[in-house]
Amino acid sequence: MKLFDVYPLFDLNFIKAEGSYLWNDKNEKYLDLYGGHAVISIGHSHPTYVQKVTEQLQHIGFYSNSVKIPIQEEVAEKLGKISGYEDYSLFMCNSGAEANENAIKLASFHAKKKKNICFTKAFHGRTAAAVAATDNKSIIAPTNESDNFIFVPFNNTTALEEAFKNHEISSVIIEGIQGVGGVQIPEVSFLEKIRSLCDEHEAVFICDEIQSGYGRTGKFFAHQHAQVQADIITIAKGMGNGFPVGGVLIAPKFQAKHGLLGTTFGGNYLACAASIAVLETIEKENLLQNATDLGNYLYEELKNDPLIQEIRYQGLMFGIELKVSCAPLRNKLLSEFNILTGNASCPKTLRILPALNITKIELDAFIDAFKILSKSNL
């Protein structure tokens, strides 16, 4: 058997990782400024993470959600306190797509309606409802096509109001910051309008914080910069620092009943141990403040570079839009400086999503490399 060839791969084989660094099978060291799509939130092989997952594995790694798993309650309590959503409930699952599937489903159960508003450049996952809410026709199979998902131009209040006027809306799903779309930040007034329209029309406000959450922007959730509250919040990626885990934060107005949602692996002991390690480290190392401070530092160092058209960022979530395609720069950062970065659906946008505990010295290595390549005209 061979692997199903769906991933374009760099010719790299990493065998060790620590903090913001990776080593390949030739013992060459790489600086990781992408974290596998914002997954590595507290750094590779963080001691607290390794210890908690190892200790848990030595006791019990898995049983299904047919028995009490008290460590799930510990995750919910810690997450509620650090996020400011203490009165919400947590449903644990395995990935971002699964979190969004359950969010859209739960919203429809609650609202008793079918139509969902989503936005241009959105990415919510590759499974049934999640991919139907994603603005990329190339990954939507015929069986996933649905007229229950209405695409509205991002940050366009007039179009949003029209969609509510013309349809019975079950939910609005929006990313706290669009990641794949190129780090597009929703305007405060736009999020406020979503909140007010959802209240007026008894629709559910779903905020997808899978990439933008868990302290990446300097707030625990990106939408908290706008001081609005979502009814449902979806999480994954940085939640487990590499261990597959996702979750749905659910407002008190939603009524739970047995069988309404379900998962085999979600909330297993190891996933919970990983999640607790991340939350404890974010709090202990004050990583929200580090994300704010170093994000501002990176912006100040790069904002006047002549190669750059625009920098869109909050905290350590960066979309650096160049005046040309970012592919040559990204390739040379990797081949000449051993620095891993990301791209986006817009070909000119370089994405930077480092661990939240990255240091100024580590960022300086990227800044120096960027400026050298910028001056060289690539």
Predicted regions and their residues:
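Conserved N-terminal phosphate-binding loop of PLP-dependent enzymes in the Aspartate aminotransferase
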Residues: 1-378
